[in-house]
Amino acid sequence: MSEIARRAFVTLLGGAALWPSAVLAQKSDGVRRVGIVMGFAENDEVWQAFLVTFRQALQDLGWTSGRNIRFDYRFTGESEERMRLMAEEIVGTAPDVILASTNSVVSAMLKVTRTIPIVFTWVSDPVRSGFVANLPHPGGKITGFHNFEPAIAGKWLAYLSQIAPGLRRVAVVHVPDIAPNVAFLRVIEAAAPQMGIAVSSAEIRNAADIERALSDFGQQGGGLIVTPSALTATRRDLIIDLAARFKLPAIYSFGFYSESGGLISYGINQLEQARPAASYVDQILRGTNPGDLPVQLPLKYELVINLKTAASLSLTVPNSLQLLADHVIE
């Protein structure tokens, strides 16, 4: 993230703590309140950039922080207990609308409120997850933007086998309590035998599970498919380090993994949903029922390849695969 974006984010966060109580009490005088619950660490630069873009988009739509809108932030990291507590806290601020990111955070929010409008981002398969009735007409007080349908897991396996053609074993790193993660596993299990690949399930719920699962799998070698979750995103450095230590080719679901040293990734750009999410928040603040706003699918997926990591694994990336890539990290 640029230094300008970093300063902007610090200013946006820090300014909230300095507003006088008279300003904070102005909801009845036209100041609208947006609660933001992110399933990541507060100092994560990826999500700082996301929020800077989100806030700027709302400002472009006429919402100026401290004048007619206020933002309340909660960052949960990977802890489900903290997600529950932060969900309760944000509801206690009486927001007009909530921006919630990741499946686990949205699950926590829906256990606390079904009446406050929610716009979700960074969610996989919201229908299977039980968040919405269907994509065109989500119903209730919730809508948003989702990342992946289960079928994309077949692409993860295919790209991994192209960049590491000798693979015969693959572990699917996933949080078993997240329904789409299990669906990803089932798709991979169905496709792998046709490619001569055996599939292992690497279930994780915390950092210790990641260390254990990848160390155990790494003893015999193979490849990794790392499914999306707050846990895998928050602990991406640990996962990437373990993959490097055990020489495990791995594919990830977002480009920021490859930017952090991951071998290959296929998924949406991490900033893609920020401006559309701001548009939905704007519409809800102006009176639109969230249940009437369709859940939006990704506009495109990006393939990102890290050639430096490939070289460290003694892998030669085919030119045909490099030509398909949206970004190649030298």
Residue ranges and their predicted role:
Residues 1-330:
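Short hydrophobic alpha-helices and adjacent helix-cap/hinge residues
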